[in-house]
Amino acid sequence: MRGKTQEDRDLIEMLDPVAESLGYEIVRLRLMGGTEQRRLQIMAEHPLLEDGSGGDMNVEDCAKLSRAVSEVLDAADPIAGEYTLEVSSPGIDRPLTRLKDFDDYAGLEARIELDRVAEGRKRFKGELAGVEDDQVGLNIEGEDDVTVYFPFAWVIDAKLVMTDALMERGAKQRAARLESDNEDLSESEED
């Protein structure tokens, strides 16, 4: 789900090491548009850490990753024709594109769409219940104590739902990130 097309997946394979070398993870990559007005959209973030920090990117992070990605793309020239590069944070109501996302955000509300009918439907909304093997767990909204599991391979779209709990978690992540950034700044001033 990080890339929809083979071209997207090839670009992810090329650019993952670039992002990782800078301390970021590519959440999603999409090369959109036809032969004209193409746009390469990359969503990235800092990895989530045990202390709750990470997960977001600021403008400086986006610019840093954009410059590094541009250098690699200019050298390899894997995209035919002109295109615009956009690097951004996935945002608070982010897409869930990797199996680990369903574990990292367990306990939060999400919308999930499958590529096939399961439990009589393709679309679900509920609280993420984590991961078991390659199965994504969801406590279905409106159902009493019903948790269903779907193979991750069936998921074609998934996104967190904006809730108070999500806003609170986002605020905690930003606070932890600011604290970490301030510690890094203090250490560099001491040097």
From Swiss-Prot:
Keyword Cytoplasm: yes
Cytoplasm recorded as keyword: yes
Entry's localization field: Cytoplasm
Domain of life: Bacteria
GO BP annotations, alphabetical order: ribosomal small subunit assembly; translation
Gene3D superfamilies: Ribosome maturation factor RimP, C-terminal domain, RimP-like superfamily, N-terminal
UniProt keyword annotations, A-Z: Cytoplasm, Ribosome biogenesis
GO CC terms: cytosol
UniProt-listed HAMAP family: RimP (MF_01077)
Function: Required for maturation of 30S ribosomal subunits.
Family: Belongs to the RimP family.
Record's protein name: Ribosome maturation factor RimP
Species annotation: Caulobacter vibrioides (strain NA1000 / CB15N) (Caulobacter crescentus)
